[in-house]
Amino acid sequence: MKRLFMSACVTVALLAAPAYATLTVGAKAPDFKARASMAGKQFDFSLADALKKGPVVLYFYPAAFTPGCTLEANNFAEAMDDFSKLGATVIGVSHDNIETLDRFSLTECRSKFPVASDADQRIMKSYDAVVGPNAVRASRTSYVISPAGQIVYAYTNGDYTHHTEYTMDAVKKFVAQAK
């Protein structure tokens, strides 16, 4: 019984432990291509192509249509006009299949920005945006990537509340310094 209790405590501690964005500011952002959806229409997203237009806000979220992820997508959708004025592209990434993201991009992203499917966790793992080594879902991690392909901001927090605000501040700071 004591062993079972200890195992349960360890499991709870591991699940409660925060994930950390381990790609640091200044690191080279891993390039990727992924199937994405915007306004319910699928397309192939390329980070390299997006960076030619300006900075990219890349945010990872655990799962479409869950409470926190829905509210986070709503927040990014509301801020898209401001991100666009700064020349920034926003893309969300999760493990969800593309058909689920077709619906999510229409309803929760309000057809304002794309979301990409990373069903094999290749992108999440390359950005150290997973909860643990055997995790299927992404940690809630946001990056701002400069047009040169460098990480200029990284933030991990399971609470969705500040991801939009903090990435907006980072984009504003980057744009101001680039002038």
PLM regions with names:
Residues M1-C9:
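Bacterial N-terminal signal peptides that target proteins for export
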Residues M6, A13-A36:
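N-proximal helix/coil linker or "cap" segments that precede and/or mark the start of modular domains
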Residues P30, P55, S139-T141:
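Short loop/turn microsegments at loop-to-beta-strand junctions
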Residues K33-P55:
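A short beta-strand-turn-helix
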Residues L47-T70:
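Short active-site neighborhood of thiol/selenol oxidoreductases, capturing the structured segment around
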Residues T70-C109, Q121-I123:
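Structural microenvironment flanking redox-active thiols in thiol-disulfide oxidoreductases
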Residues S111-F113, V131-Y143:
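Structural micro-motif
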Residues R137-K179:
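Thiol-/selenol-based redox modules, centered on thioredoxin-like
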